From Swiss-Prot:
Protein name: Exodeoxyribonuclease 7 large subunit
GO biological process: DNA catabolic process
GO molecular function: exodeoxyribonuclease VII activity; nucleic acid binding
The protein's enzyme class: hydrolase
Keyword Nuclease found: yes
Catalytic activity: Exonucleolytic cleavage in either 5'- to 3'- or 3'- to 5'-direction to yield nucleoside 5'-phosphates
Length: 459
């Protein structure tokens, strides 16, 4: 306790400026209230772009400004909103520019039972999203367990109730207590260790049990570490935490949730009287089915005995069957021989029809006919070719140059025997040959104008 704060700040009744006053007041407040917890309701919540959070913390009689800077705001897990009842931790400071004092916060937590409820809902949503509550992860409870591990407090009514139920319903089931604290901060680690130990002991099933209590009393069963330890177990677990109205995270993760520890024991301890009744029922069903089976076998045996005859009768039947088979074999052989004979006769007739002698006679007749027709065909062919040749000769005579020469025309040929078609092809004094219809004349060109050429006959 500072008895003389003014002396500590060096104040000796001097006159201060406003800035000096606010500065020294800030130092004093931060020194005295360096870390305090305050509870109140959030109002006027503001989140500027800087990432800082500002709000007013109030109760029914007063209010104070609060600042939660960006790094501290990032560590707050709960969503802040107006009207939320919270507990905050920080230091008292003074904003020198306005002379307003405020709380500079480093921690914000929901207050009271509401805080626990918000934390419960947040963890429940998280584990549900990860699939820890899904039906596919649940392990079925054994029908007739022989060894059961109980994770609970060694004192109190819970363990006595569980043992009482098993003694009454299934006294032969072996029970093993894995003691652990079930309340307080130490309970979390103890429950996790007890779960790992029990899961390694090869029990048929486990019971995680605690009696009723407040939400705070049962909170260790709502911790994430306990939930994940339950999920990691390969042994089926029955969660029996609190009364029937109490619900914990452990109930959701466990394979089966029982409303009370006694109910959990009843789930794993089938009533011996019920078992006796079930055995009696199964015995009656077994006897009935055996009697039915004996009756069916007796009837079957009688049927077989009726079908069973004397060996002599069996021999007579076999002899008769052998005679029948012999007759059928003979008949089949005869039918086969007949079919083969018919087929052979058919093939002989086809072979006779295709004999070479018959084919040769037919070909000889055809050759004689062709030999008789050949001279006549040759004469007719020669006659037709002669007529065709005469017709072509007449046609050739009509278009032949010799026929033209026979009508008084002639053809002039130069020294190389080429026909002269134009006067320009000649020269004066050139010797030419004039071919007539009969014979030739040697001529000489006297003049070769385009006018008719003048020729003179050579001696």
């Amino acid at each position: 306790m500072i008895k003389d704060p003014f002396a500590r700040l060096g104040l000796e009744r001097e006159v201060l400026t406003v800035s000096q006053l606010n500065g020294r007041a800030r130092v004093l407040l931060e020194d005295v209230f360096s870390s305090i917890w305050v509870e109140g309701e959030i109002s006027n919540l503001s989140r500027p772009a800087s990432g800082h959070v500002y709000f007013t913390l109030k109760d029914s009689g007063a209010q104070v400004r609060c600042a939660l800077f960006r790094q501290s705001a990032a560590r707050v897990r709960q969503a802040l909103k107006d009207g939320l009842q919270v507990k905050v931790r920080g230091k008292v400071s003074l904003f020198e520019g306005r002379g307003d004092y405020q709380l500079i916060l480093d921690t914000v937590e929901p207050a009271g039972d509401g805080a626990l409820r918000l934390a419960f809902d947040a963890l429940k949503a998280k584990l549900s999203d990860e699939g820890l509550f899904s039906a596919e992860r649940k392990i079925a409870l054994p029908v007739h367990p022989q060894r059961i591990g109980i994770i609970s407090s060694p004192t109190g009514a819970v363990i006595r109730d569980i043992i009482s139920v098993f003694r009454r319903r299934a006294p032969r089931v072996e029970l093993t207590l894995i003691p652990t604290a079930v309340q307080g901060r130490e309970a979390i680690n103890q429950i996790v260790r007890a779960l790992k130990l029990a899961d390694s002991r090869g029990f048929d099933a486990l019971i995680l049990a605690r009696g009723g209590g407040s939400l705070e009393d049962l909170w260790c069963f709502n911790e994430e570490a306990v939930a994940r330890a339950i999920d990691a177990c390969v042994t089926p677990i029955v969660s029996a935490v609190g009364h029937e109205t109490d619900v914990s995270i452990s109930d959701f993760v466990a394979d089966v949730r029982a409303p009370t520890p006694s109910a959990a024991a009843e789930l794993l301890a089938p009533d011996s009287s019920d078992l006796h009744r079930r055995v009696d029922s199964l015995h009656r069903r077994l006897v009935s089915r055996m009697q039915d089976r004996l009756m069916r076998e007796r009837l079957r045996l009688e049927g077989i005995s009726r079908r069973l005859r004397h060996p002599g009768e069996r021999l007579r039947q076999q002899s008769q069957r052998l005679d029948d088979l012999d007759m059928r074999l003979r008949r089949a052989f005869e039918q086969n021989m007949h079919q083969r004979q018919v087929r052979l006769a058919h093939m002989q007739s086809r072979l006779a029809a295709q004999h070479p002698g018959r084919t040769l006679g037919f070909l000889r007749q055809r050759l004689d006919a062709l030999a008789e027709r050949l001279p006549r065909a040759i004469r007719e062919q020669i006659k037709a070719r002669r007529l065709q040749l005469q017709s072509q000769a007449q046609t050739l005579n009509v278009v032949s140059p010799l026929a033209t020469l026979g009508r008084g025309y002639s053809i002039l040929l130069d020294e190389r025997g080429h026909a002269i078609r134009n006067a320009a092809q000649t020269r004066t004094g050139q010797r030419l040959t004039a071919r007539l219809g009969e014979g030739e004349l040697q001529v000489r060109v006297e003049d070769n104008h385009l006018t008719p050429v003048t020729l003179s006959l050579l001696d």
